[in-house]
Amino acid sequence: MVPFLRILGIETSCDETAAAVVERDAEGHSNVLSDVVLSQLDEHSAYGGVVPEIAARAHVEALDELIEEALKRANVSLNDVDAIAATSGPGLIGGLLVGLMTGKAIARAAGKPLYAINHLEGHALTARLTDGLSFPYLMLLVSGGHTQLILVRGVGQYERWGTTIDDALGEAFDKTAKLLGLPYPGGPAVERMARDGNPDRFDFPRPLVGEARLDFSFSGLKTAVRQAAQDIAPLSDQDVADICASFQKAVSRTLKDRIGRGLQRFKTEFPATGEKPALVVAGGVAANLELRGTLQALCNKNGFRFIAPPLHLCTDNAVMIAWAGLERMATGAAPDTLDVQPRSRWPLDSNAETLIGFGKRGAKA
């Protein structure tokens, strides 16, 4: 039987500095003792996006205090944790270095094993923490750096069914917002404006819709937004709202096609065994209510459970990193050596082809 385990998690892959203490009991149930996150939004908003050097320096300044706070809120010391889990990639290399080196130092000083965690694996396994989900299931990761449809077979067993061939969806939202003069971060700004817009005013393209492969493309949609804005300039507030609403509609229809095909493939490869299949959504874009509604309706139509973890666990956090470490420990996986290095590009499926897409938040994996 797997023993009771407790891990300190560290996350620094992009623009959130985070630390958490999480437990896993012998039956696989989770208990989050602490969850501390410091956003760098104010540091980057003036630049309209994440500046890697600023992000790395902010991690250096904040991480030690956040770890102390996480331990304090959990009412434990380093002696009370069984291991350290730190994000090792993919992401911005400067931030990864800060978090992983800190994790190494703590592991060495406290005599604890170190688990270097793939950030994407943290997202992939979160639904097991929040909903006790059984394998296999599908996960849609939609963030500023990634847009991927992943089959989750088990801990360490992932198969990428679809990925972006250019911009990630969160990146497309941010760039659209910037084109329209909206504030950073762009996703929430576009969603707010879209509420008062006419989604049928502009017929924006829906890239790759109808194709058998499950990949995504959003750069053409971004270009269409730019052209529409130029054609009707100067823009009124209503123009901006209509563009945002039409953009969101195009994204929703694209996801409906791409994910719908993925759900059908899943049902073909994994015939019903009595338990309802599940689609999990994660990443910052998962906060968008229209996109959630589209995915919920799609799952209802296809007989799937739609699982969206709480928003604070959809975006970058250390709880998911600690949980991924706990899941690995529970399988008997060996810890990493202290010479493990961060990886800016680190696909979950090791046999995947190398991608050429490169997002503003780091290499796409």
From Swiss-Prot:
EC class (word): transferase
Keywords from the named record: Acyltransferase, Cytoplasm, Iron, Metal-binding, Transferase, tRNA processing
Cofactor descriptive note: Binds 1 Fe(2+) ion per subunit.
Pfam families reported in the protein's UniProt record: TsaD
InterPro entries the record matches: ATPase_NBD, Gcp-like_dom, KAE1/TsaD, TsaD
Major location (coarse): cytoplasm
GO biological process, one term: tRNA threonylcarbamoyladenosine modification
Binding site for Fe cation: 119, 123, 316
GO cellular component: cytoplasm
Cysteine disulfide partners in this protein: none
Cofactors named for this entry: Fe(2+)
Function: Required for the formation of a threonylcarbamoyl group on adenosine at position 37 (t(6)A37) in tRNAs that read codons beginning with adenine. Is involved in the transfer of the threonylcarbamoyl moiety of threonylcarbamoyl-AMP (TC-AMP) to the N6 group of A37, together with TsaE and TsaB. TsaD likely plays a direct catalytic role in this reaction.
Family (UniProt): Belongs to the KAE1 / TsaD family.
NCBIfam families given in the database record: gcp_kae1, T6A_TsaD_YgjD
Protein name, per record: tRNA N6-adenosine threonylcarbamoyltransferase
